[in-house]
């Protein structure tokens, strides 16, 4: 396990600007801030209140009864809600909350920061190629929608690739279409079995 790296310096900006972007998942909204929260390539998914215990921001966002998931990446926070409230009401409430959280100079993580797995780089050529396609073509599109995609495993015998979808992609009604039509087709074209 390695220590999480997030930008403490940038969190203490005097001018916090935040805007929201909708995502393909109608229950998720991406809240973008004007500073870097987490170093490039890292992300943190909090699917439950219990999983959010190391992050005061995620924990406090779960204080909104309708929040069901919180996700941090680079310069944005994706919040997923239930159907009890519409975004026309929830959006300004959450946006103001996030802005005030950072204006109050609260930390993104407490002293018990979540640990990340150390990834050993002993990948086969096929896996390196797959990860390259994920990084260059797929990850940027998924991040624009407020989500993240991570390589999970590749079975060379079966030709089966498993990925992990996080943030707005988790539970999104169109995620199966994204996987089948987008990712599967691209992998078949760019990575030969």
Locate the predicted segments by residue.
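Domain-level signature for proteins that mediate thiol-based redox and metal-cofactor handling
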Residues: 2-193
